[in-house]
């Protein structure tokens, strides 16, 4: 993967996305230093675009920073970076989900629960083709079910209400096996 990403970066040296993708590959391999170098290169390339940099590119820089901190077990910094990414793009599903994960590891289950619930609530009014609809995923449902087990006064009731909601808003091909009872 890194050889392919290196070839892409050489063919389009001003494209920050290639460096960001290489950083993610390094994170997956546990190479924090390699990830940091790639993410810094992506950030510099994005900054060099100036006004031409899109909100998506700016948001990716913040999300990369958050993922780097999350992987490095620096949860407060990860939450700050993800919050900044969410401020740039309300429909940044990855930033919201990863911020919720960072909140769990930071010991703040209530914030994690609120982030996941708000992400699911945003789906109700989202256009069918909106990125916000990507929030309905088995991993989000499983994570929220786990958080309900730990925080809800009546976990069974909370999970049942969420499952009923998911059945109303989820696409037809949604994997319902993730829904606990």
Describe the role of every protein-language-model region.
Residues 1-25:
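Alpha-solenoid helical-repeat scaffolds
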Residues 1-8, 33-49, 74-83:
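Repeat-mediated protein-protein interaction surfaces in helical alpha-solenoids
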Residues 14, 18, 22, 29, ...:
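Active-site-proximal segments of catalytic enzyme domains
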Residues 27-32, 179-181:
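Repeat-unit-sized solenoid/scaffold elements
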Residues 40-44, 55-181:
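Structured C-terminal portions of repeat-based eukaryotic scaffold domains
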